[in-house]
């Protein structure tokens, strides 16, 4: 069973992989306060220098002058090694390190790329700071940076495939600098981040290794920029929410003010990706049904189509946790007449024929659904955003072979970050920006030591991590957001996870929820981006603790 769990989690991880006034480039006149360490010894190749530029963005009618710093921080693979590395990316002179001659034999490090935006003229003690990252695992943070909260954003057609270049890169009136200074972080091996040294991938590519790297990065950043006394927030999307749960528990000496989770997955046993590989676990099926029903509603596949989505979903959710879950839990003991009645109800919610549901034993995965919903039209329905659709690749396959949404928007974001980083931030000369760390030799270590350290988990479930962080820091607030049209990270599954966190009921009041009529990346729809900005900026202001 453990092998089945690991295979299934690998499938889920593979599926998850998937700026008002123009920034004025130029050397800034008032650099942010930066600490510097003393003499040091070079660690591997010297890291690229920081690039400091300045600009202005208009949000809510107010011009915000800012300074942008694009650079890297060097992080060690263990706490002991990390403590020997200075802020300049070199070993401290008194560390007594004798490095092997060959870089590939030297201790593993990662140089984590970041872009930080600081509001000019603001008192850092009164200015919150938010650390943002996408997921994957192994994905760069170009999506949140160029699609949601940076000073520039890429515009892609909502619900349809983006045409080829040139792509419109516009001033972002929804930039989050109105509420907080921002730090966009590329995970080890992604973007301009690099992993170097002996067994570097093994040292940083894994559930716990990754969280440790972000922990060390954030503490280094707080030291370098003298921001230890600022209100602190983390914002993770997709697998970034998994990272945030572990990070919020793991980070040393930091009480976070708030955690924002966008398109959440904390327990991979709840995923609709490949649940057939974990028989006996029926949660993915009844947690996915509301997302499937929402998708069918969007594509007008629901018999007797309801006029409004939310009341329809409330009915589906009640059925999911009631009759549907009960039927699944009976397994082979479910009477045939009862199975037929459940299948007919499922047809009324999803448009998939009752006969199909019966053939599937009432259990349809996300990939099955994406393939079947519009099969008669020769179309595959999107996974991360089910409003999108594309031509079938293999009409005879059981599951969707690709995600039309991911295919629709990725090229635009890769283009945007490359142009913006090189032309506006003046960073990345002679370097390749890696949208993903996935390459020959990439392997993600699924092992996770849960709170208490009672052995290693074979499947990823970080609900205990977030619960422990909230118990240790009962003033920390959590905001959960997501889209209805997403079968990759289920909105109903995210709520289910939150309602089942192992913590006192009183702490449930620290969690707030917001859902959008979009998919995984809610910000591809401008109206949803506007709401996303409003919710996030309000959350930061309410929990920053500044006066």
Where are these regions (language model features)?
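N-terminal cap/lid subdomain of alpha/beta-hydrolase-fold enzymes
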Residues: 30-39, 80-203, 499
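Alpha/beta-hydrolase fold nucleophile elbow
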Residues: 226-238
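Catalytic histidine-centered segment of alpha/beta-hydrolase-like enzymes
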Residues: 517-528
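Alpha/beta-hydrolase active-site loop
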Residues: 176-180, 187, 204-223
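Short alpha-helix in the alpha/beta-hydrolase fold that links the catalytic acid
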Residues: 247, 476, 490-500
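Alpha/beta-hydrolase fold catalytic core
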Residues: 331-488
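Glycine-rich nucleophile elbow surrounding the catalytic serine of serine-hydrolase chemistry
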Residues: 235-248
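A catalytic-pocket lid/entrance helix-loop region that shapes and gates access to the active site
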Residues: 151-155, 248-349
């Amino acid at each position: 069973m453990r092998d089945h769990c690991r295979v299934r989690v690998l499938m889920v991880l593979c599926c998850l992989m998937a700026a008002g006034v123009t920034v004025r480039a130029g050397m800034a006149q008032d650099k942010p306060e930066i600490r510097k360490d003393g003499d040091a010894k070079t660690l591997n190749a010297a890291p690229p220098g920081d690039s400091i530029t300045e600009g202005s963005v208009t949000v809510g009618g107010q011009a915000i002058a800012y300074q942008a710093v694009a650079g890297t921080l060097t992080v060690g693979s263990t706490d002991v090694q990390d403590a020997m590395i200075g802020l300049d990316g070199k070993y401290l002179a008194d560390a007594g390190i004798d490095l092997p001659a060959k870089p590939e034999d030297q201790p593993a490090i990662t140089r984590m790329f970041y872009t930080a935006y600081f509001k000019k003229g603001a008192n850092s003690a009164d200015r919150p700071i938010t650390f943002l990252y996408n997921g994957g695992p192994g994905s760069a943070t170009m999506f949140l940076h160029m699609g949601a909260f940076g000073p520039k954003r890429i515009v892609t057609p909502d619900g349809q495939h983006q045409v080829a270049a040139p792509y419109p890169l516009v001033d972002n009136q929804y930039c989050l600098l109105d509420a907080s200074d921002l730090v966009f972080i590329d995970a080890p091996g992604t973007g301009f981040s690099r992993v170097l040294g002996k067994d570097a991938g093994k040292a940083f590519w894994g559930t716990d290794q990754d969280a440790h790297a972000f922990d060390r990065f954030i503490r280094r950043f707080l030291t370098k920029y003298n921001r230890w006394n600022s209100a602190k927030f983390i914002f993770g999307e997709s697998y970034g929410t998994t990272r945030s749960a572990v990070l919020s528990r793991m980070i040393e000496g930091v009480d976070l003010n708030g955690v924002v989770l966008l398109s959440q997955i904390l327990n991979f046993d709840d995923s609709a990706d490949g649940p057939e590989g974990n028989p006996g676990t029926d949660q993915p099926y009844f947690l996915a049904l509301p997302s499937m029903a929402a998708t069918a509603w969007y594509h007008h596949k629901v018999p007797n189509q309801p006029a409004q989505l939310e009341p329809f979903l409330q009915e589906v959710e009640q059925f999911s946790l009631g009759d549907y879950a009960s039927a699944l839990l009976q397994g082979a003991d479910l009477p045939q007449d009862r199975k037929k009645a459940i299948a007919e109800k499922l047809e009324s919610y999803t448009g998939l024929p009752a006969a199909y549901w019966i053939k599937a034993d009432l259990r349809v995965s996300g990939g099955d659904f994406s393939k079947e919903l519009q099969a008669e039209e020769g179309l595959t329905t999107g996974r991360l955003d089910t409003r999108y659709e594309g031509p079938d690749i293999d009409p005879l396959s059981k599951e969707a072979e690709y995600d039309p949404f991911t295919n629709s928007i990725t090229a635009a974001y890769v283009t945007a970050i490359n142009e913006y980083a090189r032309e506006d931030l003046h960073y990345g000369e002679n370097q390749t920006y890696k949208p993903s760390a996935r390459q020959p030799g990439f392997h993600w270590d699924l092992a996770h030591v849960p709170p208490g350290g009672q052995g290693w988990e074979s499947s990823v479930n970080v609900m205990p991590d977030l619960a422990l962080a909230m118990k240790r820091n009962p003033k920390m607030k959590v905001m959960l957001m997501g889209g209805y049209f997403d079968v990759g990270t289920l909105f109903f599954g995210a709520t289910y996870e939150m309602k089942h966190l192992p913590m006192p009921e009183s702490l449930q009041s620290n969690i707030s929820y917001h859902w959008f009529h979009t998919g995984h990346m809610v910000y591809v729809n401008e109206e949803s981006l506007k709401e996303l900005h409003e919710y996030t900026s309000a959350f930061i202001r309410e929990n920053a603790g500044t006066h």
